[in-house]
Amino acid sequence: MKKLIFLFSLFIAFQAVAQEGIRFRHCSWEEAKAMAKKEKKPIFIDFYTQWCGPCLNMAENIFTLGSVGNFYNDHFVCLKIDAETGEGVELAKKYEVASFPTFVFVNPKTEKAIHISGSNQDRETFLFTGASALDPKKTSVYLMEQQKAGNTKPEFLLDYAYYAASRYNRAESEK
């Protein structure tokens, strides 16, 4: 019986570790850039505010999911930055954050945003958002350039619609 209880406890402990959500680093912007360069990963920034309801929903219901944590922890150096305090104020200005939550994916070498998304997202949309930041033909920078150039290829239009929906830009996503 003791062995059974021990094995069950061990199983529960392993399940808890395996289901870990996003591990946000608690460090400065300079430290995050250094870590990202060393780990050869882009930086994922969750810009939030204390008063933002959708930010709280993402923090409690999406960032804590094991599948989300596994993907984001494997592919990004993750930061949570309060856009109204400390260095968050300047970083929010730098990346033109105008609503919350806003998710910015940054190349640590150039410090340029490679993908920007936001709004309250479900698990699938948030995983798509992260995957898009890793695919040069699905980043917001590329999609916006293609949209301005008048690209009308069906595969582009589908990617652009998904991106617009992830920005909660209903008018653009329904075009």
Language-model regions, residue ranges each:
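Non-globular targeting/processing and membrane-anchoring segments
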Residues: 136-175
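N-terminal leader/targeting and pre-domain segments
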Residues: 19-39
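Hydrophobic heptad-repeat coiled-coil signature
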Residues: 52-55
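Thiol-based oxidoreductase modules, predominantly thioredoxin-like and allied folds used
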Residues: 22-27, 47, 58-88, 97, ...
